Amino acid sequence: MSIYDEIAQIVGPENIHTDYIERLCNSRDMSVHQGIPDAVVYAKTTEQVSAIMKLAHRDKVPVTARGSGTSTTGAVLPVRGGILLDLHNMNKILEINKKNFYARVEPGVICMQLNNTLGKDGLMFPPNPGSEIIATIGGMVSTNASGHRAVKYGTTKDYIKGLKVVLVDGSIIETGSITPKTSLGYDLTRLFCAAEGTLGIITEIICKLEPKPEYGALALAVFGNVNAAGDAVTEVTTSGIKLAGCEIMDKNSIKVVEKALGKDVTKIEALLIMEADGAKEVVVRDMNRIGDICKKYNVLEYEWTDDPARREEMMRARGGLVPTLSRIKPGNRLVAIAEDLGVPSTKIPETIRRAQDIAKKYNILIATFGHVGDGNVHTTFVCDVRSRDDWNRLKPAAEDLVKTAMEMKGTLSAEHGTGLTRAPHIALQLGPAFEVMRKIKQAMDPDNILNPGKMGLEKGKKADLYDYFTFQPLVEHPEGVNSYGLDIDNEVLACIHCGFCRLGCPTFSVTQRESKNARGRNALAYYLMNGSIEPSRELADAFYTCTTCQACTYFCPARIKVDEIVEAVRKKLYKSGYVPEPILGVRDNIIKMNNVFASAKAERIEIYPPALKEKAKKGELKAKAETLLFMGCVPSYLDMKMVPSLLKPLDAAKVDARARNFTRKTL
């Protein structure tokens, strides 16, 4: 019996997948890397995780934990194969203690869902990454994630009181305490924060909570000079004003979202979005003080509001920036390889200028934005991922950005973690302390089973920025080995694998499998396009189970045309002879009966209002009408009472209408 047969006995055969298609669907994240597991395992309890780890430890099989898969650094990719341990089904809020301000949650709980639940009791879990709508608490702990509120509230580690962790040998430990403070022994809770699953598997988290602020306001300040914007922020943050958020966008970023801003941006060099919350009288006073400070630095425009709708409108440009970067030019997309610098807040303007100089030096686009209040600068590349020349220029540009951060006494990763992307440079920042990290890893995981290949922890292997490079086949064959046509190819490449589509996909909702979600299907479309896979029955199952309802596109920040990608893949599958039998049956129904359900037209007419039914039977329905009703397949053949129910009030209102196909035989 193989280890995977044993695991199937632990989690059930429906919760382990070893087929190649499902494994490929779990091989990507938002980074430039890929890693294909040997098995995808869905665990639901700490005991299951413990049993799995005992087997993996016995057989020395690698285990990589994964939540929603939103990493920008490749941290959740199983680059050495083995087990991808998916924890997103461990999603229970186990306890909310309102009096002692803590919550116990499983690692698969989504950040926004937790806050929606807490909000009913006037509480909140402050860290809010840009992916909070899909990010799991376990993933946030593993990377010490934060967000724009970090300037006031700090990062995830500041809100973790304790953890339950499964170690490499399957033993279970609990760290921390629910008490307000403790000074007993080593702070093991912090040790597992930002460890990215290299030391243990987190299966339960005790989150520290805060009261929700009673009032909040947002200010927008527009500057014609980035230095002036930086100086204004410095004075604001050193004048006693406690900002809850402070975002900056440089001229390249502003140009990208010009349409969302709704204004001419030619004279704008920097845009600040500042947030304050707390007691109303204090916030109002601070908003006015911020305006006075900005005027000292020649602000072009300044406004603040406490209206929720206006606040949302003001944040729309910042919120839409990242996905818009993949829509600047067809075939180009954002690339996360040196996108998470952290510098002292006073160094933000100089860092932005240097990033702009680096962009000019290498003739590439770098959009610079970030959480200026806590010194976090996102320097995001945009390039043609098919261009070898672009990749050759990006690499030295990334090296220059790393040097910039080091010269500023900063950090290479402020909130996105280390993973594969930051591994080549981690020793540069940490120095001798990095060897201490390696010794800790060796002591806790001597066989290098837990998330191997990450964080540069392995001695004797020099990490490279393009390790496990997912775009290599495309660089070698930029025309696409199995192109769908340029427009569809560009749609495939525009997807950044953020996973937001999970929120809308009905087939994922039912199956909880990545092959039944838009992100997974797009990964498969990419692998088919670059020649890594061929048409197959399993591939057909992934694409013909898609309803093409476009709910994924609604949730997709970049509005990827997933339905068109699916249709393009289906054409290739059809030409190769791979179409599921039920689909062929639907085709035959349409040919024989003019509808997908093989329903006779006469059966529909029988339930219609008597006068209308008589006219239909005699063929006396008008050929034309002022209003045309197109009801679709379900009302026409399954829930058929919907049509006459609608026709009755229309008749009463004397609306001249007819439902399509009373006189045609196509439906």
Language-model features: locations:
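N-terminal accessory segments
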Residues: M1-D29, R58-V61, I293-E313, E407-Q429
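N-terminal flexible segment immediately upstream of the FAD-binding catalytic core
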Residues: M1-K54, T70-F101, G130, S253-L261, ...
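C-terminal substrate-recognition/cap domain of FAD-linked oxidoreductases
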Residues: T18-N26, C207-P211, A217-P396, T404, ...
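Soluble FAD-dependent oxygen oxidases
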Residues: G35-V63, S171, G200, M274, ...
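A glycine- and small-aliphatic-rich helix-loop capping segment at beta-alpha/alpha-beta transitions
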Residues: A75-N91, L118-L123, G147-K157, T182, ...
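FAD-binding subdomain of flavoenzyme oxidoreductases
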Residues: K92-I96, Y102-E247, I449-N451, G456
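Ferredoxin-type iron-sulfur electron-transfer modules and their immediate structural context
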Residues: G431-T545
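Iron-sulfur-cluster electron-transfer modules
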Residues: N522-L667
